[in-house]
Amino acid sequence: MQFNSITPFPENDDELHLTELVYWASSGEVAEVEKSLANGVDVNSTDDEGYSALQAAAENGYLDVVKLLVEKGANVHYKGEYTALQLAEMAEQVEIIEYLKSL
């Protein structure tokens, strides 16, 4: 989740229930994303709100994480409220928009 973005940020920590993979993807932590995937975490897992790691990385501008997740089989067409591409477009993440459109 990105501050001041389309995706609503919870008012307090009790409302925040990110999975490990979504958390690391939203932080741009490539090594931690790789470790989570190596430990068997489903690349398409979502948090309680249906927010995926690919959506998190795309919205927050982490192209390296987006590419890694796609290489590992992330569903680029998955749509919770928005697709990863739609979130990248709303957040004006140009490189990620171009990459996702090229797939």
What are these regions (language model features)?
Residues M1-N39:
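Intrinsically disordered, low-complexity regulatory segments in ankyrin-centric signaling systems
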